[in-house]
Each structure stands twice: as C-alpha cells, then as structure tokens.
Amino acid sequence: MTSPYHISTHQDESTAGQAIVPPFRVDVEPEREFVRVCPSGEIDVATTGTVRERIADLMKEGFRRIVVDLRQATFLDSTGLRLMVDLDASSRSAGWRFAIIAGPAEVQRAFEVTGLLARLPFVDANDVTHGQGP
C-alpha cells in the first residue's frame, strides 16, 4: 500500500542511476565586427569536434574575429582546453583574432588549475557586448 505522501519516480533501465545531461549545441551569433560562438552544455571529447568544425566553417565563410562564449558551458575537459589552446595558436600564426568569454566557476576551474587562465585571451563579456570584440 502506498502512502498518499509518497512520491515515486520511474527510471527505465537505460537511465537508472545516470545524471540527465542537457543536450549540447553550438549557437553562432554574428556581431558587427566579429562572430560569437556559444557552446552550451558539456565541452568534452564527444563535443569538441563539433565546436572545432563550426569555427572552421566560420573561417571558410570569411570571419576573422571569433569570440568563444563559455557562459552556457557546464563542463570543460582536457580536449576542450586543447581546443582553446589550438585556436589561440592558430589565430596568432594565421593572423586572425580570437578571444574567450569566461564560463561558470566549474568551467573556469579547468583553466585555473592548468595555468591557462593567464595564457589565453579572455575578454570581459560587457566589453564584447558593447562592440569591443577581440
């Protein structure tokens, strides 16, 4: 017999014990002088390729000023860090401009513990919003 105050939840076997992860997506927001790339969700080995491909497509379209906005990212692993390092190196060698808008604390922690926070080109979101892109 079930108490009227008992709340039961149902999980099928495929999701039992697993955290529900929001879907990953990459939004692109062209601004006047640059393009903002906004990954949402976990940036990891399964999704980094999507971000890399989208930025490559934007480069082919002629964009030469790219801001990666991490404010909607929920996680960043070593492949995500590697992507940011690669984008920075590529921008320096190929003459295009790259910047990063910081993400939430759990994302920024990855940059802090690896020493990349001081090495990569982080910009303030307010500066970017007011037309001062990378």
Question: Where are each of the predicted segments found?
Answer:
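STAS-like cytosolic regulatory interaction modules
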Residues: 1-74, 85-134
